């Protein structure tokens, strides 16, 4: 399995089984991170963490504080695809694998700008 990213008619395939999606909240200006796994059933959200709370980003009651991050395991079924929007007010989505993070624009080879990006598991 691989991860496919699709935006503005461009598709990139990344040979990864797991990745971290990172973004900066547009109002609070703090990072939110999600660990994902690519499975035959779709994209599975394994863990979420945030460095603070407020402005609609409160961690759930089961979150625990670990090294300054609120961490929890969302309980969701794998999703066939995830669509990422871009407000333009908080910088870009970043995708991290093997300790390296890159913006979606860098990965896709064009300025993502206002275009949504679809993530899905692919062969």
Residue spans of the language-model regions?
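N-terminal secretory signal peptides
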Residues: 4, 8-60
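Mature, soluble, non-transmembrane domains
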Residues: 59-123
């Amino acid at each position: 399995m691989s991860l496919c990213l699709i935006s503005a008619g461009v598709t990139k395939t990344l040979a990864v089984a797991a990745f971290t999606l990172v973004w900066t909240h547009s109002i609070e200006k703090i990072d939110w991170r999600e660990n994902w796994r690519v499975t035959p059933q779709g994209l599975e959200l394994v863990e979420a963490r945030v460095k603070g709370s407020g402005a609609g980003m409160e961690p759930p009651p089961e979150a625990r504080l670990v090294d300054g991050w609120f961490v929890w395991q969302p309980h969701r079924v794998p999703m066939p695809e995830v669509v990422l929007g871009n407000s333009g007010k908080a910088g870009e989505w970043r995708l991290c694998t093997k300790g390296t993070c890159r913006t979606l624009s860098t990965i896709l080879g064009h300025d993502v700008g206002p275009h949504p990006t679809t993530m899905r598991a692919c062969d």
